[in-house]
């Protein structure tokens, strides 16, 4: 919800019309979920020095995560699908949306 809200605020400030607001809201929802799944994956697979926290801390705390429910590969696949859907939501926009496209790719590809 935080990423979606940030994107919506930017759209409002930028003067988005109704259709653009819908597209940007969809982008924010999709990339927000992709970010969370990727964050859950990083908690399992990431480098502790880069993360700044102990790997596996979510698991140790008993937190419910996408990888715990669906497995690592399915989680990677789902994060990528969500990223692609987020990028598709930007298809009506020109290069003004390139920073959003770059952010979407970074959020998901940081696991690799």
Segments and roles (model prediction):
Residues 1-112:
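All-alpha prenyltransferase/terpene-synthase fold signal
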């Amino acid at each position: 919800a935080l990423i979606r809200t940030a994107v919506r605020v930017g759209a409002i400030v930028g003067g988005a019309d109704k259709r653009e607001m819908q597209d940007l809201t969809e982008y924010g929802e999709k990339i927000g979920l992709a970010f969370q799944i990727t964050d859950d994956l990083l908690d399992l697979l990431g480098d502790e020095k880069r993360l700044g926290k102990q790997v596996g801390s979510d698991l140790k705390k008993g937190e419910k995560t996408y990888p715990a429910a669906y497995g690592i590969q399915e989680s990677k696949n789902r994060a990528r699908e969500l990223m692609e859907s987020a990028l598709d939501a930007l298809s009506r926009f020109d290069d003004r949306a390139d920073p959003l496209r770059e952010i979407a790719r970074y959020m998901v590809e940081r696991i690799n």
